UniProtKB/Swiss-Prot annotation:
PANTHER family from the UniProt entry: PSEUDOURIDINE SYNTHASE FAMILY PROTEIN-RELATED, RIBOSOMAL LARGE SUBUNIT PSEUDOURIDINE SYNTHASE B
Protein name: Ribosomal large subunit pseudouridine synthase B
Ranges where the record places region Disordered: 1-60
Organism: Pasteurella multocida (strain Pm70)
Compositionally biased intervals (Polar residues): 1-10
InterPro entries referenced in this protein's UniProt entry, alphabetically: PsdUridine_synth_cat_dom_sf, PsdUridine_synth_RsuA/RluA, PsdUridine_synth_RsuA/RluB/E/F, PsdUridine_synth_RsuA/RluB_CS, RsuA_PseudoU_synthase, S4_RNA-bd, S4_RNA-bd_sf
Gene symbol of the encoding locus: rluB
Length: 345
């Protein structure tokens, strides 16, 4: 009789092989899953580490446009500053600026125009100033004339740290109301056609004018730079071939009033701007004279173009100083009068 051992290979050899194969397959699948997890994990960790990496701010990419900041600081209108940038006259932190550059005013950037450092923080504290000027005929709306002819800037009060910016232009043969401001953004918005700020002119024309012509001028005519028209035309007097009209426009293109009349075969012999928005030319203002606007008128212009109102103007800031100076002058005059009386006795 033969006996077999209970733990010998002859007992359940097939079952043992199946078990080992199943365990091997399970281990292989588990190792594959672990491998997939371990392979996917570093990628997510890497991505998260990359996302929390601190970004370095570039003052030339973030912030406001350079020309807008300089315009608000009273260095000129946006158009003037864009011309300066194009001429390589503006630098930011020692590098020549280009159109499209943006800056963060509070980042401590150093901006220079023609080598002169611009104090932006000081300019932000300055209040907005607006002048009404009665431009006479014969003056140019430019800062410098190579021929030495008089300009509208010659008679204006001197400024330190900023400059007067003309709100639009009047040609050499046109007189009347011209606004100046120290806020380039205000000037830019007032001049922009999208704001549709009314300009009123008193115009004397030479030629035959009839109702059909006035109707065409109000409906619109085609000029070389596009269609144009008067919003309003009112007869203001005159006889024969010389007649006066009050006309209103919603934009200020170059010589637009003259060109509109000339398109109908009529010549303009006199042109005076009398109103800009609701600001009318003061009758008491002499030709070549200027008057600084009060807070009410300054804020009217700012709100007209969507800018925040000012709390005070230069007139309010300097009022105590001017009052003290006036008092000193009065005392000096009184003292002088008393000395004269004593001397005569």
């Amino acid at each position: 009789m033969k006996f077999t051992k209970p733990n010998s290979r002859q007992n359940k050899p097939h079952v043992e092989q199946k078990t080992s194969r199943r365990s091997t397959n399970a281990n292989a699948v588990a190792s594959k899953n672990v491998k997939k997890v371990t392979e996917a994990q570093p990628k997510s960790v890497k991505a998260s580490t990359h996302s929390v990496k601190p970004t370095v701010k570039n003052p030339l990419v973030e912030g406001e446009k350079l020309q807008k900041v300089l315009a608000r600081a009273g260095q000129g209108s946006r158009r003037e500053i864009e011309a300066m940038i194009a001429e390589n006259r503006v630098s930011v932190d020692g590098k020549i600026a280009t159109l499209g550059d943006r800056i963060d005013v509070h980042a401590g950037v150093k901006i220079r125009i023609d080598g002169h450092l611009i104090n932006l923080l000081h300019a932000q504290k300055e209040v907005c100033r607006v002048l009404m000027y009665y431009k006479p005929e014969g003056e140019l709306c430019t800062r410098h004339d190579p021929e030495g002819r008089p300009t509208v800037f010659d008679r204006l009060p001197r400024l330190t740290g900023s400059r007067w910016i003309a709100v639009g232009r009047l040609d050499i043969n046109t007189s009347g109301l011209l606004l100046f401001t120290t806020d380039g953004e205000l000037a830019n918005r007032l001049m922009h056609p999208s704001r549709e700020v009314e300009r009123e002119y008193s115009v004397r024309v030479f030629g035959q004018v009839d109702e059909a012509m006035l109707h065409r001028l109000k409906k619109g005519v085609q000029l070389e730079d596009g269609p144009a028209n008067f919003k309003e035309i009112k007869f203001a007097g005159g006889v024969g071939m010389n007649q006066w009209f009050d006309v209103t426009l919603m934009e200020g293109r170059n010589r637009e009033v003259r060109r509109l009349w000339e398109s109908q075969g009529v010549q303009v012999s006199r042109l005076i701007r009398t109103r800009y928005g609701n600001i009318s030319l003061m009758k008491s203002l002499p030709r070549g004279g200027w008057e600084e606007m009060d807070l009410t008128n300054v804020n009217y212009l700012r709100e007209l173009v969507g800018l925040p109102a000012e709390v005070e103007t230069k007139l309010d800031v300097t009022k105590p100083r001017r009052r003290a100076k006036t008092g000193q002058i009065r005392k000096a005059v009184k003292r002088y009068a008393e000395l004269n009386k004593r001397y005569k006795k």
